[in-house]
Amino acid sequence: MGDIEKLTRETIASGGILAMLYFDIHAKTKELVQELGTGFINEIIHKQGVVFALGEIDEPTGGAEDKNWSSSIQLKVLAKDFAVLGAICMANSPYSVEILRPDEIKLTLANAHSLLGTMSATTAEYKRYILTKLSNKEELGRLQENLKRRADMGKDILKKDK
């Protein structure tokens, strides 16, 4: 058994997930598609909780008549747990995900909390971005009031827990 297979088995035995993620990528030039794809793969490789990742960029196509170049990226990722894989998917939006191993996923309560927290934070960030881009000054004021009220409620809850 090779080192990678041994690492994969050990990681999966302790809650890890081996998955294939598929992404599309577009840019003005063929070279830029390749550079962006390489940078993207490198970014995933260095994310906390990624045990290893191996990516492949398909040959870019297109570019005719002022059209962008396009390619696909296949990225095999060994994540230390399901929450890490979930966070990668939420942050990077693959167009498809295939879990290769294990055949069944069991979440610890801590892992479920981590995943739900990441989902909530990601959704809140998207909502904030969209609302600040589309809202007028009056709507932004109401949004800021709501955020302050939520923060105050959070402070009250934290005080009760102490």
Task: Give the ranges of each region predicted by the language model.
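Long, contiguous binding/interaction regions
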Residues: 1-162
